[in-house]
């Protein structure tokens, strides 16, 4: 991860101390999803952020723990830090939540993708 990405990640709400640890891995990337492009009103933006965060942060925590990324919901954006294959999964999960998919369907998708990630990691050895 480049210095510019680390600075941008801090600006998107990530903890600076934890973000600096990403300097070590060149494959780590930052993905920023702008919710204002989807939400037409501030009320809809709040609803989307609520769906992504979940009750008590549950949905965000599930995504982070299953896929192994770090996420931040800040302002009008959702940001994720991870490897490209992880980011692709998070992006799809965010699109599902934004489109109105049930949380259960998103969790099932994430469980399946976690198994796929584990399989691909085992295959690479």
Regions found by a protein language model. Give the residues of each.
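RNA-contacting regions in translation and RNA-metabolism proteins
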Residues: 1-125
